[in-house]
């Protein structure tokens, strides 16, 4: 009976875990659809912004920042605030360490800025002297405006770095995401013809270009953030689906074991009852 009770309690525990993983899978799937919609909208906005900048930039390979007297490279590493998303964060950390080693082998000084505390927790002991800050609670970012407010509130001056890179998991499909590095600053914008002479600017041209360049950089980072969020939710959907399948398999084995144990207990009881009747009959 003790064995039956232990099996029953274990089955109850597995059923509870199964419900939890199923709910988490459904929530992540819903969040993934929302992020995909936001990502598509951000890409469309970025396309139109790129057209405007291409029309108004002065020359080819225009650099939006002054690179003099700047030595450090800023690497923005995007991960998640939570686990239970498969190897999503492990891929980011492994790729980040490899990329940092590559930059340092070229004699460059790298500073780190983290979006999401999981990668930070995995790397803080090794790169403590390089870390500027870590931003957690990133799930509170719901649109471009909240992303800008979140970024402005950080107090990080991106203009103090010679290069700014963002490292994130790029979303391709639900089952395919790859760690990627993209350059944010300086923003090199290539065009074939300068059309500045065909337009009048109010305020001054450089002010307009500076504002558009800042918007361009923020949009690049926002798209990287959304790509990373989509990859996170996709990884969590797959991880929870796998966990749910594992609980189903475990539960079926436990049910089979429970039924066998119960049948054995019933058989034992019947044998004892029959043996008792037989002993009484013999008397």
Curated annotation (Swiss-Prot):
Membrane topology: Peripheral membrane protein
UniProt-recorded Gene Ontology molecular function terms: ATP binding; proton-transporting ATP synthase activity, rotational mechanism
GO cellular component entries: plasma membrane; proton-transporting ATP synthase complex
Keyword terms of this UniProt record: ATP synthesis, Cell inner membrane, Cell membrane, CF(1), Hydrogen ion transport, Ion transport, Membrane, Transport
Domain of life (superkingdom): Bacteria
Gene Ontology BP terms: proton motive force-driven plasma membrane ATP synthesis
Localization (cell): Cell inner membrane
Complex formation: F-type ATPases have 2 components, CF(1) - the catalytic core - and CF(0) - the membrane proton channel. CF(1) has five subunits: alpha(3), beta(3), gamma(1), delta(1), epsilon(1). CF(0) has three main subunits: a, b and c.
Family from the record: Belongs to the ATPase gamma chain family.
Role summary: Produces ATP from ADP in the presence of a proton gradient across the membrane. The gamma chain is believed to be important in regulating ATPase activity and the flow of protons through the CF(0) complex.
NCBIfam families on file: ATPsyn_F1gamma
Protein known as: ATP synthase gamma chain
Source organism (scientific name): Ehrlichia ruminantium (strain Gardel)
Lineage, broadest ranks: Bacteria, Pseudomonadati, Pseudomonadota, Alphaproteobacteria, Rickettsiales
Primary gene name: atpG
